[in-house]
């Protein structure tokens, strides 16, 4: 993904979901992330990166397990969590930096 650095350097927070198609918890995160986007709207960008299709990007960002959520604010990593994360926790963290 050649424009990844451009995406995470946006002026608004960017939540990156590193996932895999075969991952059960990743599938459970999908509707949670949709709810986050519905609640926060244009205040956040959410992108999904398939680690099987982008292994070099996953390696570069030291993704060891999926799902891994990474939140960037103006290109700087401000939060990172592996595993299933609840909507209210994600919304709260994004609102703190917005």
Residues covered by each model-derived region:
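A short beta-strand-turn-helix
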Residues: 1-13, 55
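Short pre-active-site segment immediately N-terminal to redox-active cysteine/selenocysteine motifs
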Residues: 11-12, 19-22, 65
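Hydrophobic beta-strand anchors of alpha/beta hydrolase catalytic cores
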Residues: 15-16, 46, 69
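Active-site loop/turn elements of alpha/beta-hydrolase fold enzymes
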Residues: 20, 51, 74
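Typically the conserved alpha-helix immediately C-terminal to a functionally engaged Cys/Sec
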Residues: 27-40
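Structural microenvironment flanking redox-active thiols in thiol-disulfide oxidoreductases
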Residues: 51-57
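Structural micro-motif
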Residues: 62-70
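Non-catalytic, surface beta->alpha helical segment in thiol-disulfide oxidoreductase systems
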Residues: 71-98
């Amino acid at each position: 993904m050649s424009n990844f650095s451009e995406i995470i350097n946006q002026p608004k927070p960017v939540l990156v979901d590193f996932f895999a198609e075969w991952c059960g918890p990743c599938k459970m995160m999908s509707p949670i992330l949709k709810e986050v986007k519905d609640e926060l709207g244009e205040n956040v960008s959410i992108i999904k990166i398939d680690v099987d299709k982008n292994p070099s990007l996953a390696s570069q960002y030291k993704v060891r397990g999926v799902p891994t959520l990474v939140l960037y604010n103006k290109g700087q990593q401000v939060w990172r969590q592996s595993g299933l994360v609840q909507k209210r926790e994600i919304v709260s963290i994004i609102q703190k930096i917005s």
